[in-house]
A protein has these predicted regions:
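Membrane-interfacial, low-structure loops and terminal tails that flank and connect transmembrane helices
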Residues: 24-56, 199-215
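Final/C-terminal transmembrane alpha-helix of multipass membrane proteins
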Residues: 214-238
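Interfacial helix-loop-helix junctions of multi-pass membrane proteins
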Residues: 75, 79-90, 158-185, 234-238
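Extracytosolic (periplasmic/ER-lumenal) interhelical loops and adjacent juxtamembrane/interface segments
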Residues: 81-116
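Hydrophobic alpha-helical transmembrane segments
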Residues: 115-138, 155, 159
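N-terminal signal-anchor transmembrane alpha helix
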Residues: 54-84
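Hydrophobic cores of alpha-helical transmembrane segments in multi-pass inner/ER membrane proteins
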Residues: 123-129, 181-198, 223-227
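Membrane-interface loop-to-helix entry segments
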Residues: 105-127, 174-186
Length: 238
């Protein structure tokens, strides 16, 4: 059984440690509840005590990637509006015969839900930025939100795979702002799955969830490598 902290030790506690202590009661191990290392926290806690939060670094990753994604979507929306006003307009994303977005904007592949994909993406990235800022505030997410984040990330990766295949087989071109969106979707997905698993929200065994958290950077690198190799193989001869 853990000992009660002294008054002096309580006075020296940080605000976060004090909140944990007051919420845990005297029978819980204070040092265990305030560990910042996710791997140690995962191994030490029983499932019902696991936090549904994450390190602040994950909050920063979500926020920064979301803001970059919003900017890329905004550029695509602006390009589509320019094209609607003037079909012969020179778009900023039409860099070369290989790197261009004009052909993909006003076709059905660029408007899957009846509105521009970039508009849907901007909404999704806006929600992602909000989640990132919530995590930066130190709050913990409920399980349903982790499920939504994991499912949304899976949908994002599915869209990357689909639109990459369309770019290769249908357009024969690469949209630069789309590639920016792909580049931020990949780390969001890899880290979201890892932290959701670490929080016990994906139903994985403890040791497997810890392994997923440890290799999240490798998962991200593998997805980047798959995209790069696909592009090189498809367009390497052009």
């Amino acid at each position: 059984m853990s000992r009660m902290p002294t008054d002096a030790e309580i006075d020296e506690m940080s605000e976060e440690e004090l909140e944990v202590y007051l919420g845990a009661g005297p029978t819980q191990e204070l040092d265990r509840r305030t560990r910042r290392d996710a791997g140690e926290d995962l191994a030490a806690r029983p499932a019902w005590l696991r936090r549904s939060g994450a390190e602040r670094g994950f909050g920063w990753l979500l926020t920064v990637c979301a803001l970059i994604g919003i900017l890329a979507c905004w550029e695509l929306i602006s390009a589509q509006l320019d094209l609607l006003r003037n079909p012969d307009a020179e778009l900023v994303c039409d860099v070369s015969p290989l790197v261009s977005c004009g052909d993909s904007l006003n076709v059905w592949q660029g408007n899957l839900l009846g509105v521009p994909n970039s508009f849907v993406g901007a909404i999704a990235f806006g929600a992602l930025a909000a989640i990132g800022m919530v995590l930066l505030s130190g709050a913990r997410l409920p399980r349903w939100m982790w499920w939504g984040l994991s499912a949304g990330s899976l949908g994002g990766i599915a869209f990357v795979i689909w639109f990459l295949s369309v770019s290769i087989m249908t357009f024969g071109k690469l949209c630069p702002f789309c590639m920016v969106i792909w580049s931020v979707t990949i780390p969001v997905a890899a880290h979201s799955w890892a932290w959701a698993a670490a929080g016990g929200h994906l139903g994985l065994r403890d040791n497997l969830a810890l392994d997923v958290l440890k290799v999240r950077w490798w998962i991200m690198a593998a997805m980047y490598l798959a995209v790069v190799l696909t592009i090189v193989i498809a367009f390497g001869g052009q």
